[in-house]
Every structure is written in structure tokens, then in C-alpha cells.
């Protein structure tokens, strides 16, 4: 499975009109985003995918998702997809909160019939360890057809319309 680092990139971001040569930023964002923040953002999106898997299972069990979880997901999407916050410390705190939420939802649902990395991943304690794990969460983390990968990114970015 290839990822951003396998491709020799410190980061990979192509979500805005400022991307380098219209192809994506791979060392430092034209917008000022650092590789550190880009990788923490990738891991945050990865985590909310796991939260969403548990949320889906919770709904299937006829239970409700607490509004604070919805607000958290909205906040993460806004923070990561609109490039409004390049503070690594804030992203680390959001990541820690994401793991707490995921653990809480897991406790509410029990084991679910989804064993993807988004669900099974447990966030490490330190930023250094988080950054070591971040490549698996990068945009290029899955060995997918480029069209499918692009469609997934489009759906992710379109989620902001509903916030």
C-alpha cells in the first residue's frame, strides 16, 4: 500500500486553488501549511472515519448519536478542510479527543462488523508517535484507482456544504 511518504512527499495537499503548479503541495503548502500540520490533519480525517463507522453502527442499533459528537465532526471538518487553523497543538488535542469519542462509541456499540483500520486504529499518546502513524492516513494511503480516490476526496470536501 503506497502512501504520501512512499511517494517521497513530506506531505500531500491538493484541496485549494493555491496548490503548487495546480498539482498539490508536497513539501510546504503555498498557503503556509506545514508538513506536520498536513499529516496531523490527515490523521484527524482518518479518525473521524472511524468515529463515523461506530456512529453508523449506533444508529443501526436504534440508538442516537450525541449532538456533541456531531459538533466535534463538524469542527474537525471545518478545521482541516478549510485550512483555518495551522496550530499543530490544536490538532493534537483534537486527535486525543477523537480517540476518546471513538472509545466511547465503541463502548456503546460493542464490537461492530467493520474491521477497517479506521475502526481498529488506536491513537498513540505523543505527537511524535502520531506523526509516525500519519502516513497510513494520507490522501494516497490506499492503493486505489485515481478516479475512485478523487471521488472520495470530492465527497469529503463537499461535506462542508452541510456544515
Where is each model-derived feature located?
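Long, charge-rich boundary regions
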Residues: 42-86
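Extended, charged alpha-helical coiled-coil/arm scaffolds that mediate oligomerization and mechanical coupling
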Residues: 146, 156-157
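Conserved small/polar residues in nucleotide/adenosyl-binding loops
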Residues: 161-163
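N-terminal-proximal low-complexity accessory segments that begin disordered
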Residues: 3-57
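Peripheral terminal and linker regions in Fe-S/redox and tRNA-modifying enzymes
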Residues: 3-7, 64-65, 88, 92, ...
